[in-house]
């Protein structure tokens, strides 16, 4: 079975990046900056890909984390790139990523 720790660490790194980079900017600033929009989308893709690599048993053990939804967002970003809704990206980063960061930190502490 694959060890989940490296994938969790990737998720945590991307969450930390997103949380730090979103500070002090508005949605309007975000959508006007192609480097930032690409970076944020890429971070969400990495999070989703890392989730997909977590063993099923592990995801089931930690079922409070919305693994399926995270992986689904990754699929949508990868396969429908030209239809990306930046408002959804923005809201996800503001509302969901801090909670995911917290959950992953807790899991990493428990799984030492």
Curated annotation (Swiss-Prot):
Top enzyme class: hydrolase
Keyword terms of this UniProt record: Hydrolase, Nuclease, Nucleotide-binding, Phosphoprotein, Toxin-antitoxin system
EC number from the UniProt entry: 3.1.-.-
UniProt-recorded Gene Ontology molecular function terms: nucleotide binding; RNA nuclease activity
TM regions (residue ranges): none
Range of residues in the leader sequence: none
PTM per Swiss-Prot/TrEMBL: Modified by cognate antitoxin TTE0751; probably at least 2 successive AMPylation events occur on Tyr-81.
Sites of O-di-AMP-tyrosine modification: 81
GO cellular component, one term: toxin-antitoxin complex
Pfam families noted in UniProt: HepT-like (PF01934)
Gene3D superfamilies: bsu32300-like
Chain positions of motif RX(4)HXY motif: 74-81
Highest taxon of the lineage: Bacteria
InterPro entries, alphabetized: HepT-like, HepT-like_sf, HepT_RNase_toxin
Record: active site: 74, 79
PANTHER family associated with the record: RNASE MJ1380-RELATED (PTHR34139:SF1), UPF0331 PROTEIN MJ0127 (PTHR34139)
Purpose: Probable toxic component of a putative type VII toxin-antitoxin (TA) system, probably an RNase. Probably neutralized by cognate antitoxin TTE0751. Neutralization may be due to AMPylation by TTE0751.
Family recorded in the similarity comment: Belongs to the HepT RNase toxin family.
Record's subunit section: Homodimer, probably forms a complex with cognate antitoxin TTE0751.
Protein name according to UniProt: Putative RNase TTE0752
